[in-house]
Amino acid sequence: MGPGIQPTSARPCSRTKHSRFALLAAALTARRVKQFTKQFRSRRMAEDILKLWQRQYHLPREDSDKRTLRERVHLYRPPRSDLGGIAVAVTVIALWATLFVYGLWFVKLPWALKVGETATSWATIAAVFFSLEFLYTGLFITTHDAMHGTIALRNRRLNDFLGQLAISLYAWFDYSVLHRKHWEHHNHTGEPRVDPDFHRGNPNLAVWFAQFMVSYMTLSQFLKIAVWSNLLLLAGAPLANQLLFMTAAPILSAFRLFYYGTYVPHHPEKGHTGAMPWQVSRTSSASRLQSFLTCYHFDLHWEHHRWPYAPWWELPKCRQIARGAALAPGPLPVPAAAAATAATAAAAAAATGSPAPASRAGSASSASAAASGFGSGHSGSVAAQPLSSLPLLSEGVKGLVEGAMELVAGGSSSGGGGEGGKPGAGEHGLLQRQRQLAPVGVMA
C-alpha cells in the first residue's frame, strides 16, 4: 500500500459523522422537550393548586380581578404537596409538647420548692421559658397557616384539625372565631370599625393590644383553661410552673405576635385617621434568620397579604419575588388638610422660584397610583416603605407601659377617630360565603 493511501477501515465515514450529529441533536431536542414538559406540568399543577385554594378561600379584594390566574402563579407558585405543611406543623407541635412537659414537671422553681428538692439553675429556667415562648408563637403561626389552608390544602379536615389542636394548646382560643375574624381582617384590612384587628381610633400600643386581645377572648375559653389547669394539677404539675410556662409565656408570645404582625405593619403615621389598606402595610428587610427568630417571618406582612396562600416558611421567597417584580408597599394616602397645605406651599414655592419643601403630600399621586397600578403590574414606581430593621422589642414594652398608664388615667376612650364604615360595608367573598368558608372537622 502506497505511503499516502489509508486503509478502508481508517477512512472517515461521512455517514457515521452525520449520524452522530443527528443523535446529539435528537438528544438535545428530547432534553429540551422534557424540560418544557416539566415546566408546563409544574405551572399547570400550580394553577390547579391555586384554583383549589380559591374554591375554599379568597384572594384579597384588590387582587381578585387585576391579574389572571396564570400571572399570579408566575409570580408565586404554591407548594405542590401537603407533606411539607403537615411536617412543619407536626414538628412545631411536637417540640412545644416536649418542652412544655419538661417545664411543667422537671423544672424546679426556686420559689416553689418542696422539701428535699434542688432548684433548677436560673440559666436553665430562662432558656426553657424563652424557648417555650418562641414555640408558643409557632403554635399560633401554625393555626394562622391552617386558617389560610396552607397546612393541608387537599385535606381540609386535617388542615383544620391541626389548626384547632395548635390553638387549643396555645390558649384554648375558639378556632372558628379566629377563622372568621381573620378573614374579615384580610378582606377589610385597615378599615376602621370593620377590620377586627385594626385600632378603634386610638393607635396607642397598650390600648390597641388590650382591645385586640379582648376581641378574641370568650367565656368558654376561660372555662377550658380552668379545667385544663386543674387536670394538670391532678397530674402533678405545680401551680407556680403553670403560671410561668402556661400563662406568662403565651402572654409574651401574644404580645410578640401583635407587635410584629399587627402594630408595626399596620400602624398609621401620625395624623392619619382614615383607612390603611394592606398595600401600604410595612414589611421587613431583615435577614431570613432574623425574620424567623423575630416572629416566624410574620414581619414580612405585606408579602403575606399579597400572597395569602403562601405558608409562613415561604414568605422570604415571596419577598424575593416582590423585589424582582418591582412590587413594593405604597405610601399612605395624605389627609385632605395636609394635601391642601402642601399644595399651597408648592404654589408659593413655584411663584417665588424656590424649591418646594419636602412633604408627604408629594406622594399623594403615587398613593393613588398604588391603588390603581398595583394589580396591573405597574407598582414598580411606587415608593417602597420597608423597615430597614424592626423596632426593638424594648421599645414596644416601653410603649406598652406608657399605654397602661394612659389606661389607668382614663385615656382609653376611643370615641371618635377614624372614618368608621358600617359593619359589613364593602363586604366581599368571605362574609357572603360563610358556610363554604367555615372550618370543618374541628374539635368541639
Swiss-Prot record:
- Asked whether the keyword Cytoplasm is assigned, the reply is no
Which spans of this chain does the record mark as coiled coil?
A: none
The top of its lineage is: Eukaryota, Viridiplantae, Chlorophyta, core chlorophytes, Chlorophyceae
Keywords annotated in UniProt: Carotenoid biosynthesis, Oxidoreductase
Q: Which organism is it from?
A: Chlamydomonas reinhardtii (Chlamydomonas smithii)
Q: What class of enzyme is it?
A: oxidoreductase
According to its UniProt entry, the function of this protein is described as: Involved in the biosynthesis of ketocarotenoids which are powerful anti-oxidative molecules. Catalyzes the conversion of zeaxanthin to astaxanthin via adonixanthin. Catalyzes the conversion of beta-carotene to canthaxanthin via echinenone.
Tell me the gene name: BKT
Task: List compositional bias (Gly residues) regions by residue number.
Answer: 412-427
Can you name one GO molecular function term for this protein?
oxidoreductase activity, acting on paired donors, with incorporation or reduction of molecular oxygen
What GO biological process terms does the UniProt entry carry, in alphabetical order? carotenoid biosynthetic process
TM regions (residue ranges)? none
Q: In which pathway does it act?
A: Carotenoid biosynthesis; astaxanthin biosynthesis
Which residue intervals make up region (Disordered)? 408-444
Q: What is this protein called?
A: Zeaxanthin 4-ketolase
Catalysed reaction(s)?
all-trans-adonixanthin + 2 AH2 + 2 O2 = all-trans-(3S,3'S)-astaxanthin + 2 A + 3 H2O; all-trans-zeaxanthin + 2 AH2 + 2 O2 = all-trans-adonixanthin + 2 A + 3 H2O; echinenone + 2 AH2 + 2 O2 = canthaxanthin + 2 A + 3 H2O; all-trans-beta-carotene + 2 AH2 + 2 O2 = echinenone + 2 A + 3 H2O
Could you name the domain of life of the organism this protein comes from?
A: Eukaryota
**What InterPro entries does its record include?**
FA_desaturase_dom (IPR005804), Fatty_acid_desaturase (IPR012171)
Q: Enumerate the Pfam families for this protein.
A: FA_desaturase
Q: What is its EC number?
A: 1.14.99.64, 1.14.99.63
